[in-house]
Design a protein with these regions (language model features):
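Short active-site-adjacent structural elements
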Residues: 73, 102, 131-133, 152-157
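Single conserved hydrophobic/aromatic residue that forms the stacking wall/gate
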Residues: 1-7, 11-12, 91
Length: 177
């Protein structure tokens, strides 16, 4: 009886050491010598926690790509812009789920917070192009974080959910599509 419990505990411990939750600090393999991660951080508190934690690993540079959902509190946009601008080396502002809002209106709200902290940033509304920008500019020792979408595999525009999985976008970029 004891032997079966010990065996089970060891299996559980081994499994816990290798478990990966989709969209939470999910590392995506790329041909580059930088680290690319997908995380669901979609508010200021989770983004601050993520960036503060990543900074402890002493990356050469942190790229933080994110957008904010439409038809949601505007304050979240300002706050996330400020947090990323303060804690990342480069903030890449893009589209998330604009829902029934214009993507550039959401991006402009995010930029209010970005400007408050006065960090370096670029604005690329098309999420695939924004990801491509990060992948092309990241270098050895850098960490690229794609924040906000996490496990989601869609982008909601004007009430319609369109398939969009960041993992697929990354693969398309790698393959030159």
């Amino acid at each position: 009886m004891l032997r079966s419990l010990v065996g089970s505990e060891m299996c559980i411990r081994d499994r816990l050491n290798t478990i990966q939750v989709k969209g939470r600090l999910e590392i995506i393999k790329t041909p580059g010598d930088y680290t690319l991660m997908i995380d669901y951080a979609h508010n200021a508190m989770s983004l601050e926690s993520l960036l503060t934690t990543i900074r402890k690993y002493n990356p050469k540079k942190i790229y933080c790509l994110f957008g904010c959902g439409g038809n949601r509190a505007k304050a979240r946009r300002y706050e996330m812009g400020e947090v990323s601008s303060k804690l990342a080396d480069l903030t890449v502002v893009t589209s998330d789920n604009p829902r029934n809002e214009e993507p550039m209106d959401i991006i402009n709200d995010i930029l209010i917070g970005v400007h408050k902290a006065d960090g370096e940033y670029v604005t690329i509304p098309d999420r695939k192009e924004a990801i491509k920008y990060c992948m092309e500019h990241a270098g050895a020792g850098d960490i690229v974080i794609l924040a906000g979408k996490g496990h989601e595999d869609y982008q909601e525009i004007k009430g319609v959910k369109h398939h969009m999985d960041e993992r697929d976008l990354i693969q398309e970029i790698i393959e030159g599509r």
